[in-house]
């Protein structure tokens, strides 16, 4: 007797969870983890699945249904980012259809973004450091955030005068841009949630709900660069 999608979903999910928890599964689970195979398999360029949500969904669904893995890596928040990266002018990466060819894979550029003498500044206030240092250095269209005021200065009447930075045309442009990118992000998150539900109804669980970056990766890959991080 053929199993229902719901039965297959629970069977695959248990298999994957058992393996993650160190229990012995009924067999080795096979996840589908791909950055660009789904696009090529479905006959799209990489740029099409980076800029077009419908083509991305179709390519991932076709790949999952044809290969029947035990779980799949969700791709919307990973890949459907072309328009948002264009808007912010993201510097440390090149993506299909943006500065490189439509069928060229993502290229992450090894760069020194955080300076070697800025560790104390980062440690003392990571949130302020990222807003005022990292974001302007990685997003050319958000450089106005270099003037972002330190929230600790918002005490008493400081809340008035330390908002002066937001009165400039450059800061307004940056705020408007962040609103537009935020709307794109919300739309992409919703598309991914809908796709996960859609695939669950077909019997396939998503591989994970989130990810973390270890401290070494955060510093070396995304802040100091390989040379700076290794020398540190």
State where each predicted segment sits.
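Catalytic cores of TIM-barrel enzymes
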Residues: 1-232
């Amino acid at each position: 007797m053929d199993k229902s999608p719901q039965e297959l979903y629970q069977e695959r999910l248990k298999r994957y969870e058992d393996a993650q928890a160190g229990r012995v599964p009924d067999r080795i689970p096979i996840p589908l983890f791909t950055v660009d195979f789904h696009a090529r398999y479905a006959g799209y360029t990489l740029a099409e699945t980076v800029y077009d949500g419908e083509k991305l969904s179709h390519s991932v669904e076709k790949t999952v249904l044809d290969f029947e893995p035990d779980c799949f890596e969700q791709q919307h928040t990973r890949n459907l980012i072309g328009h948002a990266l264009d808007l912010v002018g993201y510097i440390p990466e090149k993506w299909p259809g943006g500065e490189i060819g439509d069928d060229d894979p993502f290229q992450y550029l090894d760069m020194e973004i955080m300076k070697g003498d800025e560790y104390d500044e980062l440690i003392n206030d990571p949130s302020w450091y990222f807003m005022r240092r990292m974001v302007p250095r990685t997003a050319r269209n958000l450089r106005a955030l270099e003037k972002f005021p330190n929230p600790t200065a918002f005490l008493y009447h400081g809340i008035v005068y330390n908002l002066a930075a937001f009165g400039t045309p450059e800061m307004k442009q940056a705020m408007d841009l962040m609103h537009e990118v935020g709307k794109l992000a919300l739309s992409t998150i919703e598309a991914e949630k809908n796709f996960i539900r859609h695939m669950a109804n077909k019997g396939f669980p998503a591989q994970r709900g989130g990810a973390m970056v270890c401290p070494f990766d955060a510093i070396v890959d995304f802040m100091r660069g390989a040379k700076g991080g290794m020398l540190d």
